[in-house]
């Protein structure tokens, strides 16, 4: 039953996320984490992501707003890459992926990784099981990670810098809006 699979804060969301990160830590260099959220301020999650990085886990995050983790610091967050996309649209989608292939656990959620969201608000993360939906979410992740127009990379110094512009130019928000319009016309 899908209801039994939901992770809900303040009851189980934070502990589940921490456990999922621990699972990736056990995989070491084969571990993978992708997170798309608006804010990252929860100290326990930040510490656990740093542990994952030190274990060799590759962590890619797209965080639109507040981010209290500095990526790329040797022996601390060297395996973490963080980008931010601020464009025409306010981002509301939140995606968490842990692992790869058949072992990947994917969630869509209402929760940012902020203490107020993980401990004091009612928020939900829903696992994604349907292969077609998973493929669509992976396609969205790929587009967001390839944005070379609006995306900015967070440096170890806490400065956001433009991603190197390559061809073809890709504004992820515009591209995804065009895709949504095409889908609506079908």
Model-predicted regions and their roles:
Residues 1-2:
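Short, small-residue-biased leader/transition segments that mark boundaries at the very start
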Residues 9-186:
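PLD/PLD-like phosphodiesterase catalytic module centered on the HKD motif
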């Amino acid at each position: 039953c899908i209801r039994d699979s939901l992770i809900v804060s303040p009851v189980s969301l934070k502990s589940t996320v921490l456990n999922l990160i621990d699972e990736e830590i056990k995989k070491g260099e084969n571990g993978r984490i992708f997170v798309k959220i608006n804010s990252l301020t929860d100290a326990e999650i930040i510490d656990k992501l740093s542990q994952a990085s030190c274990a060799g886990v590759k962590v890619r995050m797209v965080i639109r707003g507040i981010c209290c983790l500095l990526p790329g610091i040797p022996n601390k967050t060297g395996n973490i890459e963080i980008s931010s996309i601020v464009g025409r649209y306010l981002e509301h989608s939140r995606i968490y992926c842990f692992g790869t292939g058949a072992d990947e656990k994917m969630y869509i959620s209402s929760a940012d990784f902020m203490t107020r969201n993980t401990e004091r608000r009612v928020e939900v993360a829903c696992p994604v099981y349907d292969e077609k939906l998973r493929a669509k979410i992976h396609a969205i992740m790929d587009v967001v990670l390839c944005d070379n127009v609006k995306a900015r990379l967070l440096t170890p110094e806490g400065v956001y810098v433009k991603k190197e512009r390559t061809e073809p130019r890709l504004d992820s928000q515009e591209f995804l809006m065009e895709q949504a319009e095409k889908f609506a016309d079908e």
